[in-house]
């Protein structure tokens, strides 16, 4: 397997308890960074229905453009190569307004992100794939069960082992999301691009090479760094069988403790562990005296 990397079809789930203003800010900060070229950038936002209206309002107020069905089809046909079922390399890292123009869609020049509402995830919805540009799929879900389902569908379509994002104040749900998603890194309440590459929003190792583990046919799920490039040599010495001896249940160690030997009942045999110096100093004779 390769050390890293793999495709990142990153889902971003905004759960009903999330700080919505911050979640939207994080999403825009991440998706507009390098015009969405980072493979860890969000490829779809999955929003609980109860937040959808406020989500759309906030995004529109910040120059994000929601495509209608006709516009979605035009952008989809241009952004995703139908033969390869992969992103058109011409759009990678390009501004949203440029992409819209090439697709035949008129949007304001200051548009930051093109957002397409989709009914489901799958090959029949090309914009649910990795896009590496400021084009974002958008799904509305009833609850966290459906939110998790859509997030995993995104990963299964082409992002296994990479990254997944969740915005929530429910720590138990965040933990469950982390346990459920088949990814190497789960970004919680942070922008995915900056969060996945590490150091800025968390303690992940800073790296632009993100391992996807066995899910993505990589050898590691970590952020690849110099540590992964160091050859470690191990000398394996022969190990003998364990040596042991039995000690008594009580050990007396204070001064003059050998006097207790006189009071111990049932002693028929004694084994004295000593050395020549202790013999010369007379310490062994003291022990023998009390044993007799």
Give the location of each predicted region.
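Short beta-strand/turn micro-motifs composed of small residues
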Residues: 47, 168, 190, 273-274
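ALDH superfamily catalytic-core signature
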Residues: 2-122
